[in-house]
């Protein structure tokens, strides 16, 4: 495993590579995303622990998305079952480590939203973990305290995202123990913070541009009432492309995970 340091403009390359990868097999990636959403919804219905189960499974599912990207580049068929690739293809030790990462992710997210309670007294925490959120009125979501809590959560989530950005795939594909994987992930994200900043701004600009563009178009057509109906599939496509770009960031920061693995195109010159 080699940790690669890249320039800020590489963030644009990752952005383009994510879109290119999605275009290789758009139907498969949209299907994967829908399958993921459905699975997480069903898992969350489990009594008592349902709110935490999706977080527990996220690291393993992340490996599945990465495997789907790898197989798409290799020209292999991608089926929804690849989402559980992390739990079935690398042995019981890797499965245990991925679940350990999931447990650490639960603790990290609980800490983030617990701190957000300083802003709104725990409203956001209740919503995210299903702790009596059904009793909250609409006024609670519109209060200044709730907005402050959201800002606190967003700020604290940044280091959590850095820890878990590469940790699952490092654990599954490089046999790195969970704690070391979290450390290497943070180091890689920090060393390439310029590229990640450009990368994040580009995705934010795309999402914002599509949202405003579709809203303006629907208003011009006199169909504003249907704007949300049009925006939902657009949001799904953008999110699926974003997920594809995660693989590009991994390859950009750590190179090829195995001998003979297919290469991503360098889209910087296109």
Curated annotation (Swiss-Prot):
Indicate the transmembrane segments per the record.
24-44, 45-65, 98-118, 150-170, 198-218, 226-246
Q: What happens when the gene is disrupted?
A: Disruption confers resistance to cellular contact-dependent growth inhibition (CDI) CdiA-2 of B.pseudomallei strain 1026b, but not to endogenous CdiA. Unchanged binding to B.pseudomallei strain 1026b inhibitor cells.
Choose one Gene Ontology CC annotation of this protein and give it: plasma membrane
Q: Which InterPro entries match?
A: BPSS1780-like
Q: Which UniProt keywords apply?
A: Cell inner membrane, Cell membrane, Membrane, Transmembrane, Transmembrane helix
Taxonomically, the superkingdom here is Bacteria
Membrane-topology annotation of the record? Multi-pass membrane protein
Localization (cell): Cell inner membrane
Q: What does this protein do?
A: (Microbial infection) Probably transports the toxic C-terminal region of CdiA-2 from B.pseudomallei strain 1026b across the inner membrane to the cytoplasm, where CdiA has a toxic effect. Expression in E.coli makes the bacteria sensitive to the tRNase domain of B.pseudomallei strain 1026b CdiA-2.
Please give the NCBIfam families that the UniProt record associates with this protein: BPSS1780_fam (NF041043)
User: What protein am I looking at?
Assistant: Probable inner membrane protein BTH_II0599
């Amino acid at each position: 495993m080699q940790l690669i340091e890249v320039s800020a403009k590489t963030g644009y390359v990752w952005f383009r590579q994510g879109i290119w990868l999605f275009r290789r097999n758009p139907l498969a990636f949209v299907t994967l995303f829908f399958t993921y959403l459905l699975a997480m919804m069903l898992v969350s219905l489990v009594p008592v622990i349902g709110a935490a189960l999706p977080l527990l499974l996220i690291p393993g599912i992340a490996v599945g998305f990465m495997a789907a990207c790898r197989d798409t580049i290799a020209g292999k068929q991608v089926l929804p079952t690849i989402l559980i690739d992390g739990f079935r293809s690398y042995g019981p030790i890797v499965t245990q480590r991925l679940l350990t990462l999931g447990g650490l992710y639960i603790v990290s997210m609980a800490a983030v939203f617990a701190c957000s309670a300083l802003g709104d007294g725990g409203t956001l925490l209740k919503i995210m973990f299903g702790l009596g959120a059904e009793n909250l009125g609409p006024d609670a979501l519109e209060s200044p305290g709730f907005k402050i809590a959201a800002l606190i959560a967003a700020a604290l989530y940044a280091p959590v995202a850095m820890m878990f950005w590469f940790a699952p795939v490092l654990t599954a594909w490089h046999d790195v123990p969970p704690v070391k994987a979290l450390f290497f992930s943070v180091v890689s994200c920090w060393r390439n913070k310029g590229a990640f900043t450009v990368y994040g701004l580009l995705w934010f600009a795309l999402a914002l541009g599509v949202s405003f563009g579709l809203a303006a178009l629907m208003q011009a057509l006199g169909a504003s009432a249907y704007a949300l109906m049009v925006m939902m599939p657009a949001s799904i496509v953008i999110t699926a492309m974003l997920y594809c770009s995660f693989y590009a960031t991994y390859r950009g920061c750590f190179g090829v995970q195995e001998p003979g693995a297919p290469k991503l195109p360098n889209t910087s010159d296109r």
